[in-house]
């Protein structure tokens, strides 16, 4: 088999679709080419393929050395990461400032205490059974809209913290 032309690593991978290719970014990284031979069973013990590393020269128009270009790009990426950190920290502080309505309102013990209509007995039995096991850490939200809206029961059970709770037979 004939020797193939040396290829760089960039020849094996497609460029990223979202990143913009800048001529300065490709010139700051060394180009690695692999010159491999075809191997048959007899040549397995031979040495691995040769790897040649060449550094690309920066644009003559910029007048910067490759080291200066690499340093400038590094500082550009550091500045961008600091900007992203500032934006993300603002978003996190806003998210921490949001308080759920359930934290502000003392929830009722039984759904019928909130609603002036009778709750389904099966739902109350489930709630009472869980309330015995969990205690005051169990909250229940129960909505019932009228039949004209075609909305059936919406039920939500929320348990605050159940670590260390064990069921005892009584």
Swiss-Prot record:
Transit pept. (range): 1-53
GO cellular component: mitochondrion
The name this protein goes by in its record: Probable inactive uracil-DNA glycosylase, mitochondrial
Family affiliation: Belongs to the uracil-DNA glycosylase (UDG) superfamily. UNG family.
Record function comment: Probable inactive paralog of AtUNG (AC Q9LIH6) generated by a gene duplication event and subsequently disrupted by at least two transposon insertions.
Main location: mitochondrion
Subcellular location: Mitochondrion
Keywords of the record: Mitochondrion, Transit peptide
């Amino acid at each position: 088999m004939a020797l193939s032309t040396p290829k760089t690593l960039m020849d094996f991978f497609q460029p990223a679709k979202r990143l913009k290719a800048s001529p300065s970014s490709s010139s700051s990284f060394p180009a690695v080419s692999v010159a491999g031979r075809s191997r048959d069973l007899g040549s397995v013990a031979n040495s691995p393929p040769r790897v040649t590393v060449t550094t690309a020269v920066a644009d003559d128009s910029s007048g910067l050395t490759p080291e200066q270009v690499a340093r400038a790009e590094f500082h550009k990426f550091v500045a961008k990461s600091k900007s992203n950190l500032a934006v993300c920290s603002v978003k996190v502080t806003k998210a921490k400032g949001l308080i759920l309505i359930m934290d502000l309102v003392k929830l009722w013990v039984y759904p019928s205490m909130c609603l002036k209509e009778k709750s389904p007995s099966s739902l109350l039995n489930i709630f009472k059974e869980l309330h015995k096991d969990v205690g005051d850490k169990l909250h229940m939200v129960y909505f019932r809209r009228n039949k004209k809206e075609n909305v059936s029961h919406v039920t939500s059970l929320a348990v605050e913290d159940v670590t260390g709770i064990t069921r005892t037979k009584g």
